[in-house]
Design a protein with these regions (language model features):
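Mature N-terminal, pre-catalytic/accessory segment of carbohydrate-active enzymes
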Residues: 9-60
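Alpha-amylase-like alpha-glycosidases and glucanotransferases acting on alpha-linked glucans and related
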Residues: 17-24, 29, 38, 75-230, ...
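Catalytic domains of carbohydrate-active enzymes, especially glycoside hydrolases
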Residues: 21, 48-72, 324-325, 524
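Short acidic catalytic loops
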Residues: 61-68, 240, 246-252, 321-336
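Active-site pocket-lining segments that scaffold enzyme catalytic pockets across diverse folds
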Residues: 229-242, 246
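Gly/Pro-rich turn-and-neighbor structural signature
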Residues: 233-234, 247-252, 257
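Structured C-terminal cap/extension of enzyme domains
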Residues: 541-595
């Protein structure tokens, strides 16, 4: 049933139904920062990624989905990058083979200087790991420049700078000003002449030659870091190709307000609105999110400007992503049809969390959060929004190729979005407990479309174990005799039995997660969807959560998997569990094939 990595499958052929109907792809979603390599320095890197590719290939997992890899600033969310193209330097593996000019003494000296137990931390200590890696890379760059390099390596670096100038020029200027501003990417706080690329270029032209040399030296270092990062990821792509493992990337709908992209060309964006998502039943833990929704802080796009340049910025963004990944997930693809906007920046969220509509309007020029370019209140508005999205969708498909695009179509989904995506051959995501019938039953497994990606969770959701344990605890507490506890218990039983009925098993009494874990995994794998992806925590049955929407906490985007990837198979219980999963799949395939 499952395509094995050794079969050299093509994800695009599977999702576009070019492969035989029985063929499917199983995958895992892992935040790179969470991986532990045998020799990482406090954050997952390209070496850990190679280990993951090896592990996946050995377990017949044909697809690895990652979160965005673009460079972040003071906010470490991979969905709030400071560049739509530049890669996060933290992903660079510090070894002499992959970093020209680097020596072991460089690493050792900086380790002594920082004095930090990089490999023993259970979270990514960005406040230490970022400056540590930056310091090591500066040492390596200095040696790269001063020591004799072979001509081929030097030519490779210089050629790369020339080829990437379209985005690199603005990025290195933006990033150099950030360094001058103690790492603060908020260009609105920079001197006026530094706030846009055009303004900075005018400032630069007026400098004395020695002052220009200082800037140019920093630009070269920043270019070199990006060259090293792109070089390493190109090798990861080649390594994955050799192992037959497909890589799925992630392109967020928006970019950071304080990004090199806005700095380069603010006219591409509508900076008066802040993109996000409306309130959803799934996210009720945060007062602001419950009241207003999620304010991501990303600027909206100026549609007229984007169309005037034939979506050149978007085309570049997709092309660069596809240099590393075989396919990509378009985060919040609903946004290409219509996007929810806030008339204030996220810094103001606490101010408006409990405010009335009238109070907000009085401070925001009569504006309230709303959909752009228009709501879906009438059939004609829905049709216009669908046409708006499909113009955008055609551009994405032109650049991504067949099967290269997967749409994250979760949340409050307009009724025209999924038919629109399917009509263009774009699969969306299917989370079983969000796929509901009119009577609140979970949609039966046989009603799922083949052109879909099935999963239990994204990086924003509770792992299966957390959800199950919470239900069981609520049920146990329901025997306290309190009316409220009894009501909560009955609701929890309803949730448990609804999911269990969908998955094909019974829960007559309280059961530990270990008793149902394999049953839930099997249920997802048996869906008709051509692609099935497990969050790594759901496959392993662990409780880590990587992000809580709306929360601002060190725990977001920082949790690390306890064991290095190279040691996962030393866990006998995990190894036995995975063996059972694949043994079960073989039996399913035999039945479905009539053998």
């Amino acid at each position: 049933l499952w395509l094995r990595p050794t079969e050299k499958f093509d994800f695009q052929d599977v999702i576009m139904r070019s492969e035989p109907a029985s063929k499917k792809v199983s995958g895992i979603l892992v935040p790179l920062f969470a991986l532990r390599g045998a020799r990482d320095f406090g954050v997952g890197d390209t070496e850990a990624m190679r280990d993951l590719i090896d592990w996946s290939a050995s377990h017949n997992i044909g697809l690895i989905q990652l979160l965005p890899l673009n460079e972040t600033g003071s906010d470490h969310s991979p969905y709030n990058a400071i560049s739509s193209v530049a890669l996060e330097p933290l992903t660079i593996a510090l070894n002499a083979c992959d970093v020209p000019g680097l020596t072991e003494s460089d690493i050792a000296e900086e380790q002594r200087h920082f004095g930090w137990p990089f490999r023993r931390c259970n979270r990514v200590a960005y406040e230490v790991v970022k400056p540590f890696k930056r310091a090591v890379l500066r040492r390596a760059f200095t040696r790269f420049k001063t020591d004799a390099q072979d001509e081929a390596t030097t030519a490779e670096f210089e050629g790369w700078i020339a080829r990437e100038s379209e985005w690199l020029t603005a990025y290195v200027r933006f990033r150099a000003i950030m360094e001058l501003s103690q790492g603060d990417e908020r260009w609105s706080l920079w001197p006026m002449e530094f706030q846009t690329l055009k303004g900075f270029d005018r400032y630069f032209e007026g400098l004395a030659q020695d002052e220009k040399f200082g800037w140019m030296a920093e630009w070269e270092f920043l270019s070199w870091v990006q060259w090293v990062a792109h070089r390493q990821w190109a090798r990861v792509r080649a390594y994955a190709d050799g192992k037959g493992v497909s890589l799925m990337g992630d392109i967020p709908f928006g970019v950071n307000y304080y990004s090199a992209d806005v700095f380069e060309c603010p006219d591409r964006f509508d900076l008066t609105w802040s993109g996000g998502a409306p309130p959803e039943p799934a996210f009720q833990d945060d007062v602001f999110v419950k009241r207003w929704g999620q304010n991501w802080g990303v600027p909206l796009y100026d549609d007229a400007f984007q169309e005037s340049e034939d979506f050149a910025w978007w085309r570049r963004r997709v092309r660069k992503n596809r240099e590393i990944f075989h396919s990509f997930r378009m985060d919040h693809i609903l946004g290409i049809y219509r996007i929810y906007g806030f008339p204030w920046r996220p810094e103001m969220n606490s101010r408006f969390a409990s405010a009335s509509d009238e109070a907000v309007q009085s401070e925001c020029g009569g504006r309230l959060p709303r959909f752009h370019p228009r709501p879906d209140d009438t059939d004609s508005e829905k049709q216009l929004n669908r046409e708006h999205g499909e113009r955008f969708l055609r551009v994405l498909l032109e650049e991504s190729g067949k099967g290269g695009l997967v749409g994250e179509d979760l949340g409050t989904v307009p009724d025209y979005v999924r038919p629109s995506l399917l009509s263009h051959g774009v699969p969306g995501f299917r989370i079983p407990y969000w796929e509901l019938e009119w009577d609140t039953r979970l949609t039966p497994a046989d009603a799922y479309d083949e052109c879909g990606v099935a999963t239990y969770a994204t990086h924003d959701h509770d792992p299966l174990r957390v959800m199950w344990d919470r239900w069981m605890a609520t049920i146990a507490k329901g025997e306290s005799g309190l009316h409220a506890d009894a009501e909560a218990r009955d609701r929890a039983w309803w949730e448990v039995r609804r999911l269990a009925n969908w998955a094909g098993f019974e829960v007559p009494c309280i059961k530990p997660f270990e008793d149902v874990h394999l049953l839930l995994v099997r249920a997802l794998l048996r869906l008709p969807c051509r692609v099935v992806i497990f969050m790594i925590t759901d496959l392993f049955g662990t409780a880590q959560r990587f992000n809580v929407p709306g929360a601002v906490a060190d725990s977001n985007w920082s949790a690390r998997i306890e064991t290095p990837v190279s040691e996962w198979d030393r866990d006998p219980s995990l190894k036995a569990f995975l063996s059972e999963v694949h043994h079960d799949l073989a039996r399913v395939h035999a039945r479905s094939s009539g053998r």
